[in-house]
């Protein structure tokens, strides 16, 4: 299962819950004679389970209008910018910015880079030197073995365990790269956990409980839950290539505009790691018999969470890729996938690869399966409410009408003005009310002037 985070981690797309502060150093020398702000050497530190801290020694020599920190991670199009309280002139200060894991989960093996930007009152903008830190899972004493592309890290099991995992990983990368016509040169880190709790802690609280492996293409890292005695199990030789295929897929389609549908990514990973097996085929056929097939446009983003629907989504995905290869050939599949690197839409990619848009491809896939497209389910108009007596059917849409003169004999819904007699009666009532109010006020004032003073009052 890939973890595709647009622009790198949720906190870069939303609000960062982080602390930003300025520490003024007491007892240091007064204002510097230099005309420009003085940036000291920036530092960055990380503590697993807590977060990342950036510090920048800084001595302003004039009024500072704004201080910002620019944070980037692998895969981002641009930096995340956060304002930090500007120090007053002209004492040495240490600017501080924290990314807290308690507020937004930080994935291990992520490198955070920060650079400080200061804007003076006159509009002059100055940049400090960038600094970076790798956020690592330091709970274990990791062992490492490396191949041409893959670096395996594990803490439980002998050296043979790591080497076996390396062989599986290198083959998975090589097979996917050959199919998609890409060359992988950047290293891929493969972290193996033997403890379930530690594994899920590393991936974060949003991880589904049925996940045994997860690839993070932005940091070119794969995490897997494999115990030493499971390394030769059949599922290991399936899960590892599956997840690593996602990393190669990302290399083939990488662009800042549009990512391919989820079913194509997962379907290709299943197709390469195990194929359209009898078990997947059986799941799809059962869904067809029960009219429970999920259209491909319902599998473009997240897959269903219930167990049966979750596995059906994978079965349908590999079924669609299998149909694509059987009908149009592997070269068409590769052309389709590689076209995404240009940032095209799904229809444009499919048209470039197989000569048909997505809807036409889906119709052909369903026909090949002997299935019918399910009825679309989505927002529907609410039921009509109770109607007034004498009404029938849906009421007409009301139109706004300004009141105006009405022809003689024509009824009007506009309010009618009171007659002259009514106006006189209303006027008398108003006068009477005013007289009563005046009399009441006079009586209250007289009562106050004749009351005896209390014991504490002065005569």
Predicted features, each with a name:
Residues 1-8:
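N-terminal secretory signal peptides that target proteins for export/translocation
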Residues 13-27:
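Bacterial N-terminal signal peptides
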Residues 30-139:
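Beta-strand-enriched, solvent-exposed domains that form extended recognition/catalytic surfaces
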Residues 141-261, 290, 303, 313, ...:
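Juxtacatalytic substrate-recognition/specificity segment
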Residues 209-222, 234-239, 244, 251-394, ...:
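Acidic/His/Gly-enriched intrinsically disordered linker/tail segments
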Residues 405-435:
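Extracellular Ser/Thr-rich, low-complexity/disordered mucin-like segments
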Residues 426-459:
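C-terminal membrane-anchoring or membrane-association module
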């Amino acid at each position: 299962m890939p973890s595709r985070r647009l622009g790198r981690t949720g906190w870069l797309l939303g609000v960062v819950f982080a602390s930003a502060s300025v520490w003024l150093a007491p007892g240091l020398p007064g204002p510097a004679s230099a005309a420009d702000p003085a940036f000291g050497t920036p530092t960055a530190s990380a503590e697993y389970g807590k977060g990342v801290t950036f510090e920048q020694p800084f001595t302003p020599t004039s009024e500072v209008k704004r201080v910002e920190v620019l944070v980037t991670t692998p895969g981002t199009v641009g930096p995340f910018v956060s304002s930090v309280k500007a120090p007053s002139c002209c004492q040495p200060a240490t600017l501080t910015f924290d990314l807290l894991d308690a507020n937004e989960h930080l994935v291990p093996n992520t490198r955070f880079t920060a650079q400080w930007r200061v804007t003076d009152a006159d509009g002059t903008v100055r940049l400090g030197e960038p600094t970076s830190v790798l956020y690592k899972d330091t709970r274990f004493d990791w062992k490492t073995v490396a191949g041409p592309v893959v670096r395996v890290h594990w803490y439980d099991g002998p050296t043979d365990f790591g080497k076996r995992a390396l062989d599986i990983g290198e083959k998975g990368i090589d097979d996917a790269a050959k199919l998609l016509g890409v060359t992988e040169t950047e290293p891929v880190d493969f972290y193996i956990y033997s403890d379930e709790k530690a594994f899920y802690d590393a991936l974060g609280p949003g991880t589904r409980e049925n996940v045994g492996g997860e690839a993070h293409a932005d940091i070119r890292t794969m995490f897997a839950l494999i115990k030493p005695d499971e390394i030769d199990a059949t599922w290991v030789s399936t899960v590892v290539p599956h997840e690593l295929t996602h990393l190669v897929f990302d290399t083939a389609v990488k662009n800042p505009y549009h990512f391919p549908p989820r079913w194509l990514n997962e379907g290709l990973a299943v197709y390469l790691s195990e194929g359209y097996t009898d078990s997947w085929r059986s799941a799809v056929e059962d869904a067809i018999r029960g009219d429970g097939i999920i259209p491909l446009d319902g599998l473009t983003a997240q897959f269903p969470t219930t167990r049966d629907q979750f596995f059906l989504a994978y079965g349908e995905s590999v079924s669609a890729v299998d149909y694509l290869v059987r009908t149009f050939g592997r070269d068409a599949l590769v052309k389709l996938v590689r076209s995404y690197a240009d940032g095209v839409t799904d229809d444009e990619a499919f048209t470039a690869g197989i000569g048909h848009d997505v809807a036409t491809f889906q119709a052909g896939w369903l026909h090949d399966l002997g299935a019918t497209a399910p009825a679309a389910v989505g927002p529907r108009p609410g039921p009509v409410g109770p109607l007034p007596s004498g009404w029938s059917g849906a009421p007409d849409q009301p139109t706004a009408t300004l009141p105006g003169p009405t022809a003689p004999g024509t009824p009007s819904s506009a309010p009618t003005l009171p007659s002259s007699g009514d106006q006189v009666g209303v006027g008398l009532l108003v006068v009477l009310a005013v007289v009563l109010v005046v009399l009441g006020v006079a009586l209250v004032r007289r009562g106050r002037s004749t009351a005896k003073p209390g014991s504490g009052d002065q005569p």
